[in-house]
């Protein structure tokens, strides 16, 4: 019963549907189609677009998968929240860079580990740079 229904759709109804579609002979013929003819073509064109997309989807470029979902992988994991407080008045250098990627071996001071992290994940994180105001 089910196979007979499927066979009827494929052998009888689908060819009859395709014969009734207002497909023009040339590209210019698409311009002359009326609104009702376009509405009759929409389901057919939608199915063609879906099949085309499904055919090329494996070849589309995929986003680079991030290697790790956690940001902080190892620094002060025993604390519920990592906070480092540094008084700006205590800065002895003209410029200081602090880590924001959590990959630095000298955390909280930046050692440039974000460069490798950015390369691997496609991220764009960088350090927090504090400079003394020049007067």
From Swiss-Prot:
One of its GO terms (biological process) is regulation of autophagy. Residues 1-37 are lumenal. Its cofactor is [2Fe-2S] cluster. Binds 1 [2Fe-2S] cluster. GO terms for molecular function: 2 iron, 2 sulfur cluster binding; metal ion binding; protein homodimerization activity. Keywords: 2Fe-2S, Autophagy, Endoplasmic reticulum, Iron, Iron-sulfur, Membrane, Metal-binding, Mitochondrion, Mitochondrion outer membrane, Transmembrane, Transmembrane helix. Coiled coil: none annotated. It is found in: Endoplasmic reticulum membrane; Mitochondrion outer membrane. Its main location: endoplasmic reticulum. GO terms for cellular component: endoplasmic reticulum membrane; mitochondrial outer membrane. PANTHER family: CDGSH IRON-SULFUR DOMAIN-CONTAINING PROTEIN 1, CDGSH IRON-SULFUR DOMAIN-CONTAINING PROTEIN 2. Belongs to the CISD protein family. CISD2 subfamily. Homodimer. This is CDGSH iron-sulfur domain-containing protein 2A. The gene is cisd2-a.
